[in-house]
């Protein structure tokens, strides 16, 4: 069988019928798999010497989370270098990247493979891979026919990447206008929750607003900060990271704002702080809720006026810094308890983002597992690391209280265990290789983190916030003022006075 004009026209029509790029990509490879009667097809994007799966058909779901480096996959490297159709013989010594990843045939090797590099002009932007268990499957199709398919796919991918680039505001003022693929930030996931988060990141990235990123421990808040920075006009300048929880009080101010020689014992020279390092760029303050009230006041001044003072220096320095902050605490409760400044909270949370916990991300668990499996494979020098069907079900049924970080550690541990019990360099992860426990402390929900009262000014915002927290405390404590005061960690007399001022009691 060979391609007819009708078949090629059908493929082109399918590319136009999809709603959104992802749907078009999926239609393309599904149609190709049917036309070619092969066992698996995949559309991959090329970036930084690796191929990133965009859509698959006939392959295990975790393939979408894997990142295939050229160094780790000789067949994909051959496709990237070829510039034309690549046919791998059935007896090729080069391992297939999808060995063990075709459902129902995990123990069998892929026999026939065709690779089609995709170009935008002279730039490699991706590849189509076609795999079959029958060695002669692709012999009836000529190279010219396969080139036509590659041209259709390359056009669709090139247009999609260009639109993505424009939508993400990567065509910045003063840029050359040359097409450049978007750099990946490893925010892996196709669930509705992650899709919504990515949309919100796109919305806020092009602005200069401060962003407060909330979410449970281990959800990937730092990746969100990186994604915002890389998609912003400040991407050409530094993204500076500071973990506020790891700062001793004695050096915290110096870390943030710098110091001059002789400012304190041990200050043997002038030193720039994180704000100076991030000038014209972005400063990411992780665990912002751990800062002392004194430092919060100084941070607020920087956000308000854009100037800093080094420790021991009376002069002010102007800085242009965008601040991204992250926390796993409910800062509204921290404000009411007097541990976090209300004015700073509202300054930071101009555009709040909430990173969903892994248990709310559905099949993203499997995609992330595939990503970590591929990392382990490269790190340990293994030929392949795959998940058994039972292991996939086990991962999907678990609650993941430690979120993505727990999944990463679980995969790494399982690979080590599986490798120890099986000879050779091929590892299959089974259910028994995972020892999972769901003991975890509660964390704030998306609703509690994102809810901000509508208001006209900071004072009104603060009073509305305090009023709502007092109402909640009273409702939860049967309107017992003493119990409510204890819950809010304040004196009952002060609570009465505050409630009276806010109009909650006569």
Curated annotation (Swiss-Prot):
Keyword DNA-binding: yes
DNA-binding feature ranges: 481-500
SUPFAM superfamilies: GAF domain-like, Homeodomain-like, P-loop containing nucleoside triphosphate hydrolases
CDD domains (UniProt xref): AAA
One GO BP: phosphorelay signal transduction system
InterPro entries given in the database record: AAA+_ATPase, GAF, GAF-like_dom_sf, Homeodomain-like_sf, NorR, P-loop_NTPase, Sigma_54_int, Sigma_54_int_dom_ATP-bd_1
Residue numbers of 4-aspartylphosphate PTMs: 57
Keywords: ATP-binding, DNA-binding, Nucleotide-binding, Phosphoprotein, Transcription, Transcription regulation
Domain Sigma-54 factor interaction per the UniProt entry, residue ranges: 187-416
Superkingdom as given in the UniProt entry: Bacteria
Pathway(s): Nitrogen metabolism; nitric oxide reduction
GO molecular function: ATP binding; ATP hydrolysis activity; DNA binding; DNA-binding transcription factor activity
Positions contributing to ATP binding: 215-222, 278-287
Stored NCBIfam families: PRK05022.1
Family matches, as HAMAP family: NorR
Function: Required for the expression of anaerobic nitric oxide (NO) reductase, acts as a transcriptional activator for at least the norVW operon. Activation also requires sigma-54.
Protein name: Anaerobic nitric oxide reductase transcription regulator NorR
Species of the source: Salmonella paratyphi C (strain RKS4594)
Gene: norR
């Amino acid at each position: 069988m060979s391609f007819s004009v009708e078949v090629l026209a059908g493929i082109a029509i399918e590319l136009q019928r999809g709603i959104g790029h992802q749907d078009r990509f999926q239609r393309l490879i599904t149609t190709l798999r049917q036309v070619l009667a092969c066992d698996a097809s995949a559309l991959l994007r090329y970036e930084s010497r690796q191929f990133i799966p965009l859509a698959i058909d006939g392959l295990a779901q975790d393939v979408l989370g894997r990142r295939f480096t050229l160094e780790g996959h000789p067949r994909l490297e051959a496709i990237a270098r070829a510039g034309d159709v690549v046919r791998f013989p059935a007896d090729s010594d080069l391992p297939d990247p999808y060995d063990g990843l075709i459902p129902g045939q995990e123990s069998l090797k892929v026999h026939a493979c065709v690779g089609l590099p995709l170009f935008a002009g002279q730039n490699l932007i991706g590849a189509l891979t076609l795999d079959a268990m029958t060695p002669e499957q692709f012999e009836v199709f000529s190279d010219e026919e396969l080139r036509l398919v590659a041209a259709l796919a390359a056009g669709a991918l090139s247009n999609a990447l260009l639109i993505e680039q424009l939508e993400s505001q990567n065509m910045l003022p003063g840029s050359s206008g040359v097409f450049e693929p978007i750099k990946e930030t490893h925010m892996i996931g196709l669930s509705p929750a992650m899709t919504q988060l990515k949309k919100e990141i796109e919305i806020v990235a092009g602005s200069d607003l401060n962003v407060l990123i909330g979410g449970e421990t281990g959800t990937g808040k730092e990746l969100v900060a990186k994604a915002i920075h890389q998609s912003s006009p400040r991407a050409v300048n530094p993204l500076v990271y500071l973990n506020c929880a790891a700062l001793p009080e004695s050096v915290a101010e110096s870390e943030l704002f710098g110091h001059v020689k002789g400012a304190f014992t041990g200050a043997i020279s002038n030193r720039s702080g994180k704000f100076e390092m991030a000038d014209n760029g972005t400063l990411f303050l992780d665990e912002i809720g751990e800062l002392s009230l004194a430092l919060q006041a100084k941070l607020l001044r920087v956000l308000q006026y854009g100037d800093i003072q080094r420790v021991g220096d009376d002069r002010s320095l102007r800085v242009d810094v965008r601040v991204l902050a992250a926390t796993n605490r409910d800062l509204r409760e921290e404000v009411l308890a007097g541990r976090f400044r209300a004015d700073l909270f509202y300054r930071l949370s101009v555009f709040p983002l909430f990173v969903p916990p892994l248990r709310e991300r559905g099949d993203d668990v499997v995609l992330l597992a595939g990503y970590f499996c591929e990392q382990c494979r490269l790190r340990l020098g293994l030929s392949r690391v795959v998940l058994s069907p039972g292991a996939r079900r086990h991962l999907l049924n678990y609650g993941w209280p430690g979120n993505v970080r727990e999944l990463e550690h679980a995969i790494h541990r399982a690979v080590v265990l599986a490798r120890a019990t099986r000879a050779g360099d091929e590892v299959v992860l089974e259910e028994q290789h995972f020892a999972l426990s769901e003991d975890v402390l509660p964390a704030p929900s998306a609703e509690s983190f994102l809810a901000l009262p509508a208001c006209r000014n900071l004072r009104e915002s603060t009073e509305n916030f305090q009023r709502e927290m007092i109402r909640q405390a009273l409702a939860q404590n049967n309107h017992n003022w003493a119990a409510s005061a204890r819950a809010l960690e304040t004196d009952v007399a002060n609570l009465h006075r505050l409630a009276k001022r806010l109009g909650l009691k006569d």
